[in-house]
Amino acid sequence: MSKRLDKVKLVKGRQWERQDPIDNIGVSTYVLIKDAIQEGRNDLAKDLADYVYFWETKFARDTNFDLIAGWPEFVRINYGEYAEIEDQRAAMIQTRMWKLPFTEKPTVQKREQSPYDYTMGYGWRMLKYHRMGKNDGAGGFTIEEYPDRYEFVWDPCYSGGRPRRGDPVTGTPPRTSPLYTGNQVPHPWSWGKTGVPGYCMHCALIHNIMDVEQRGYLQWASGYPDDPWKPCTYIAYKDVDWIPEEYYTRIGRTKPKVTSTAPRPKDVNKLIRVIHSDELGPEWVPTLTMLKKAIDAGKKKEALKIVDQMRDEMGRISMLIWNWSWMELIIEKYGYNELYHALRSIPCSYALPPAPEEPRPTKADIPNAEERARRGALWGRSDRSGPNADCSVNIIDEPDRVVMELAPCGSGGRGLMTIDTPGMERGPVTGNPWNFKTTPVAHPVAWNKVGVPNYCARCCVHMEMGSLSRYGYLTTVIERPENATDPNCRWFFYRDVDDIPEKYYTRIGAKKPARQK
């Protein structure tokens, strides 16, 4: 019998939480799912699978998506819409590492793949890794076939559409107002529309404009709806020469000369069929669904493999590189002070600022050290911390505080390491080809230390300064190693926040509050 499994306390309320004893909260939920499968505790295994998919992974994941969405909005509000798209382009080039050059007059070059096959390849990654479609991707998506095209229907797009609608799983409202209000003037990179959030603009830029700049053709047309409750679509034409001129005009480009001899069908709006992604083959079935079916069928070996597959899929999205690229851009162009203001303008689920009408919390409102450690452990597990990204943390219960060790941290720390996961192989992101940097001078945004990886400033501002802003106290203290290449951080949760040494306030430019009785 698994002692760690017996300690699991899964609370299923409006939000699902693991309220395990303090000595168990660092254990990977994926390990616990495996324990439950091996012991035949199938209901618990499926409950833990739902929890890790819908709640645990979303904690850091959605915050990282919101962070990506926040950078262009910050630049637009403070430096204008042309600066926003200039920085978007630079971030896309660094994130994607294109091999082909961009040019105003590219050599017109059709892909060897059909538009449908090309979009299908991308769509599979969007479903599995990006969680596009209904119910956070667990409900799949549909493809509508018309005589001249296929429309991939994302209802919603997880990264852009979810923030526009709000999140039905977590119950959070739309992010659009007042945070992500979008452009005020129509541009080619907003499909000629206004009010397009900065995150959504990257689809116009990367999937439309930049593709035309490389090959002369659109890979697909992006269907961005004005109404957030209507789905986004990838419109893949059966022949790229059939793509209407309007899709080029709206992005400020000219349609290439038609070379196809195939006549475009006339009744193009006649729906031929609707295909659900589950019908495309077993590889298209959401992994959560596959896992539950294997558990119900008693196929333990298969289920155990699917658990590893699900954990692996949660890490196959480039949010670390994307966010780090944006941070490097802001530091280089605008400086560390502006990085601070950018981070403070983007809410973080770990330490949300008080709502305007909410009374300022007091020391008495601060959760106890164990509860804060549970939240920290949730972040660490969600952020894929631990050896081999196993989504675990180490918890040490000390007399005056609870210590959480990230060995390594799943984001900034893992970025400093060589990764050999098949399909994701890379060296440290501080080396080629990214060459991300560390702080050259001491600054409060990075604990007044030199040599801190720039990405780590995110934890300093969101976790430490965020809690200070909310409570007037540091409720989480983070100790970043002095060695810039060391990926292992420690978080401290003091039992009495008055016992936090003053140096932890001083290093972020704050003053320690007077001790309260």
What are these regions (language model features)?
Residues 1-488, 492-517:
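N-terminal accessory segment detector
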